Amino acid sequence: MNTQARLTSTQWKARFKGYVQVTKPGIIFGNLISVAGGFLLAAKGDVDLVLMLASLVGLSLVVASGCAINNCIDRDIDAKMQRTCKRVTVTGEIPLSHVLLFGIALGVLGFGILALFTNTLALLFAAIGYVVYVGIYSLYMKRNSVYGTLVGSFSGAVPPVVGYCSVTGQMDMGAVILLLMFSLWQMPHSYAIAIFRFNDYAAAKIPVLPVAEGMAKAKHHIVLYIAVFALVSTMLPLAGYTGTAFMAVTCATSLWWLTMALKGYRQDVDMPRWARQVFGFSIITITALSVTMALDFQAVSQTPLFTLVR
């Protein structure tokens, strides 16, 4: 009996771990930082803790839902990739229908929290980001188009905008800059992953840029997107949304990231190692900017492009 009980306990622990893994906790944590950054930038020191908690929890559940359903959709290509071949949706450790229902339940709960505590615009952005990620990117673009990364970058840029709009209830220039900034950041971040995971993507026949059009073109795009990202990031302080501290941090991190990317043109470059460095510093860059904009906000007058309040 004791042995059987221990075995059952072990199985339940493994099952729980599997459910956690399908939500991709690393992605959730990264999005939490960007949501908090957008929220605190908009709040400008006048923080509604209940609203902030609801925005963080609601959006995290929505992201977790999208990731779980993405695991269901990608199970066939995940089986061909070394990095993902042991996911529970591939091994059958958890039935596919259970993961799908789990994802739906997370989505209902997440959208419910956003609907109850935030406003129409924040909810709308969360819904659009979800549809783009699950319905357009995961179901079609990722498998069939080199532009899948570009489409997916929009959904990846939604979380800070949801945080921002939860406070303002309006789409102003600050929200537009955040959307552009985080969309641009996604591109070199994702291309770097595609380079050091090249063999996996090639095996699964996923037409990411390095696989579909070559490493050289991917390097050009990485440098170009980092350069444009650096310029767009300066718009927050130039438009008065943040101060000199943010300007200093964005210039320092972006220029260092760009310098790192340019090293990819060396003749003797170790491409996988270089790509991992570009990827790693992309996380440092966006984390630093999210934290700095949360602290270095300015009381700029917000002129809405349009307003949707609850």
From Swiss-Prot:
It is found in: Cell inner membrane. It catalyses: heme b + (2E,6E)-farnesyl diphosphate + H2O = Fe(II)-heme o + diphosphate. The keyword Transmembrane helix applies. It is a multi-pass membrane protein. GO terms for biological process: heme O biosynthetic process. It comes from the Bacteria. GO terms for molecular function: protoheme IX farnesyltransferase activity. The chain crosses the membrane at residues 25-45, 49-69, 98-118, 121-141, 145-165, 176-196, 222-242, 245-265, 277-297. InterPro entries: Protohaem_IX_farnesylTrfase, UbiA_prenyltransferase, UbiA_prenylTrfase_CS, UbiA_sf. Its EC number is 2.5.1.141. Keywords: Cell inner membrane, Cell membrane, Heme biosynthesis, Membrane, Transferase, Transmembrane, Transmembrane helix. Pathway: Porphyrin-containing compound metabolism; heme O biosynthesis; heme O from protoheme: step 1/1. Carbon 2 of the heme B porphyrin ring is defined according to the Fischer nomenclature. This is Protoheme IX farnesyltransferase 2. It comes from Shewanella sp. (strain MR-4).
